Amino acid sequence: MKKVPIKVCVSNKQKDVPIRVQSAKKLVLCCLQYWKITTDQVYIYFLDDKALAQIHDEVFSDPSLTDTITLPIDSPGISSHPHVLGEAFISPKAAIRFLKDRSQDSDLLYEEISRYVVHSLLHMLGYDDQTPEERKKMRVKENQALCMLREKHALLSD
């Protein structure tokens, strides 16, 4: 049986940070390959704060700003056709605020947004960050993935 390539759908509906769609697709595919995850589809949406706050309100009844929202759909290992791993809604502007609040170099902007994508993918895989232990475990996985992405020159770029 012929293996069908993973369809990574990326939409950029914000103007705060230039995002190269192909760069985002490469990042997602590298992570899924690194983690040995098979799926048919993954959706990544880069949105402005207003749109993300609206989704946050619709899904969680909380209109506050956030950096990412992840909606896992089909868990890894579940048989469905097509298998949709999930959807990630990401605010690049949140990364700008994060770096500014910590007086960090804006050169780290694309790495921070890459972290948001990796973080969302981990949520799609079932990782959670509600407790300090879960956050620590998730941060380790994020850092491992970011290290791999750096080596493969697969972090987001402009």
UniProtKB/Swiss-Prot annotation:
Keywords: Cytoplasm, Endonuclease, Hydrolase, Metal-binding, Nuclease, Ribosome biogenesis, rRNA processing, Zinc. One of its GO terms (molecular function) is RNA endonuclease activity. Gene3D superfamilies: Metalloproteases ('zincins'), catalytic domain. It holds the Pfam family YbeY. It is found in: Cytoplasm. Its EC number is 3.1.-.-. Zn(2+) binds at residues 119, 123, 129. Transmembrane segments: none annotated. GO terms for cellular component: cytoplasm. Binds 1 zinc ion. It comes from the Bacteria. GO terms for biological process: rRNA processing. Signal peptide: none annotated. Its cofactor is Zn(2+). Belongs to the endoribonuclease YbeY family. NCBIfam families: rRNA maturation RNase YbeY. Single strand-specific metallo-endoribonuclease involved in late-stage 70S ribosome quality control and in maturation of the 3' terminus of the 16S rRNA. This is Endoribonuclease YbeY. It comes from Chlamydia felis (strain Fe/C-56) (Chlamydophila felis). The lineage of its organism: Bacteria, Pseudomonadati, Chlamydiota, Chlamydiia, Chlamydiales.
